[in-house]
Curated annotation (Swiss-Prot):
One of its GO terms (cellular component) is virion membrane. PROSITE patterns: COV_M. This is Membrane protein. GO terms for molecular function: structural constituent of virion. It comes from Porcine respiratory coronavirus (strain 86/137004 / isolate British).
């Protein structure tokens, strides 16, 4: 918003007679007394007129946008987080549609330089959109989790316990993974991922899935109190490869489960 205001002031200083500051109360004449009227200024898409009449609306929109970006996290509000994800998913097709429409408009008026920039923007947007789907499908192939299609998810922590696979989206690959057991509830990265757990249910290894590979973390240390089902377990990287993260319920040893390939 500040950048737009600075740009508007610069335009007004250099060629102020060409822009309407605001519509007069008595009609369409400009307050700055120019020969042109505000209707013609608005039809030409002048920035000063738009900001003077719509600055409050844009302020509200930007406040909502900032709130969604800052507090759109699961630990704050799932509702705001859902709105944030919806916005991020819709941005790709909206930007693609705008660049294609702008390319068509520029071609109609023979502005071929801007037409070329619009085509380049459309191609870049389309390629980035395809890359998002490719990486998401690769990650889903390993985890079978819908978190794979979260635009913010770069990796997924997978914990197999009680015959099930529990997942948690991550922004990056951790150096080590700590699982905390509090009164039978299992926590990872501060989030509760499972309940009804006991010390014996803690896995010997956990995995972090990436689109290109799966990293295996092996248990190296733990401190547990059996009477209250409370404690912690720490895992470090041991190997990486094309491993599946799905929980196996058949009669396989831990090593055979680990070597199960996608």
């Amino acid at each position: 918003m500040k950048i737009l205001l600075i740009l508007a002031c610069a335009i007004a200083c250099t060629c102020g007679e060409r822009y309407c500051a605001m519509k007069d109360d008595t009609g369409l004449s400009c307050r700055n007394g120019t020969a042109s009227d505000c209707e013609s200024c608005f039809n030409r898409g002048d920035l000063i007129w738009h900001l003077a009449n719509w600055n409050f609306s844009w302020s509200i929109i930007l406040i909502i946008f900032i709130t969604v970006l800052q507090y759109g996290r699961p630990q704050f509000s799932w509702f705001v987080y859902g709105i944030k994800m919806l916005i991020m998913w819709l941005l790709w097709p909206i930007v693609l549609a705008l660049t294609i429409f702008n390319a068509y408009s520029e071609y109609q008026v023979s502005r071929y330089v801007m037409f070329g920039f619009s085509i380049a923007g459309a191609i870049v947007t389309f390629v980035l959109w395809i890359m998002y789907f490719v990486r998401s499908i690769q990650l889903y192939r390993r985890t079978k989790s819908w978190w794979s299609f979260n635009p913010e998810t770069n990796a997924i922590l997978c914990v197999s316990a009680l015959g099930r696979s529990y997942v948690l989206p991550l922004e990056g690959v951790p150096t080590g993974v700590t699982l905390t057991l509090l009164s039978g509830n299992l926590y990872a990265e501060g989030f509760k991922i499972a309940g009804g757990m006991t010390i014996d249910n803690l896995p010997k290894y956990v995995m972090v899935a990436l689109p290109s590979r799966t990293i295996v973390y092996t248990l190296v240390g733990k401190k547990l109190k059996a009477s209250s089902a409370t404690g912690w377990a720490y895992y470090v990287k041991s190997k990486a490869g094309d491993y599946s993260t799905e929980a196996r319920t058949d009669n396989l040893s831990e090593q055979e489960k680990l070597l199960h390939m996608v």
